[in-house]
Amino acid sequence: MSLIRGLISTIYYLPKIYKWFYRPYYFLSLLMTLAFVIVRCCPGLCEHLPSQREDGDSCAFDWREVEIFMFLGAIVMMKNRRAVTVEQHIGNIFLFSKVANVVLFFRVDLRFGLLYLTLCVVFLITCKPPAYMGPENIKYFRDSTIDEELQRDSRVTWIVEFYANWSPECQSFAPIFADLSLKYTCLGLKFGKVDIGHYGAVAERYKVNPSPLCKQLPSLLMLQAGRELMRRPLVDKKGRAVSWNFTEDNIIRDFNLNEIFQKYKKFSKGEKPEEPQPVLEEESESPLEEEEEDSESKKDK
């Protein structure tokens, strides 16, 4: 099922994926992924490679190499079951294909393995995935502005993402969060981001651990008047994040975005905001108090 879903998703986003390979990162990643296949099947190169096939054909895959490719496919399918975006699907394919290429090149020749491993290290250091540059309606906070901005208006609900640029999960989640900000931003609901890789003090104040071992990045916090109402993912007693998929549907459901948006939607049309909810609750309780006073007065009589 996961293989079929991934295949359908790839076909659906094929025009978008096609444009990615104009970018150096994705183009070079594709070459690194197909490196062993190119070397093994390219005339003029494959004739000089050793082979363990019975017929001695060095331009064809032996059975052990086929097994490694099959194992690679199984690992990619397992990892892509939790992938949310197309970027995550493609990233998993690139990552585990490079690992498989390292094993395959070392089987052929130690020198080829060391050369490919060196290329992978250089690529990892010099090439970074392109950051999301699409439309969004997000306010970026700094250490000195986040507390003041969150407490400025107690009627505004903030959905704040705590992220780090080095985190692949945060990079994959960026287009999802941007799309949500475009759909749900209104006068009473706003979206913000803070880079805890640069502002570690903010992470400490809001109890978000940036360590990769804790897997708390990205973290989404719902805040109102500077007070935390909800967060995802949740954190257990050991400080590790409880598994939670950062899909658009999960965020809309768990944070009640539809209800909050409908509540504040009329504010964006220029209507005067209503009184805060606590005042309305007090007004709704006042008739009950009057009834109790009337009953007590009747008893006294």
From Swiss-Prot:
Note the InterPro entries from the entry: Thioredoxin-like_sf (IPR036249), Thioredoxin_domain (IPR013766), TMX2 (IPR039101), TMX2_thioredoxin_dom (IPR037463)
Subcellular location(s) per record: Endoplasmic reticulum membrane; Mitochondrion membrane
Provide the membrane-side ranges marked Extracellular in the record. Answer: 20-111
Q: Where is the composition biased (Acidic residues)?
A: 280-295
Q: Name one GO cellular component term.
A: mitochondrial membrane
What Gene Ontology biological process does one annotation of this record name? brain development
Gene3D superfamilies documented for this protein: Glutaredoxin
The record's section on PROSITE patterns has: THIOREDOXIN_2 (PS51352)
* Keywords from the named record: Disulfide bond, Endoplasmic reticulum, Membrane, Mitochondrion, Signal, Transmembrane, Transmembrane helix
Q: Tell me, what's a Pfam family for it?
A: Thioredoxin
Translocase listed as a keyword: no
Q: Which residues form the Thioredoxin domain?
A: 122-269
Renumbered ranges of motif Di-lysine motif: 298-301
Q: Which domain of life is it from?
A: Eukaryota
Ranges of the Cytoplasmic topological domain: 133-301
Chain segments annotated as transmembrane: 112-132
Q: Name one GO molecular function term.
A: disulfide oxidoreductase activity
Quaternary assembly: Monomer. Homodimer; disulfide-linked. Occurs in both reduced and oxidized monomeric form. Oxidative conditions increase homodimerization.
Q: What is this protein called?
A: Thioredoxin-related transmembrane protein 2-A
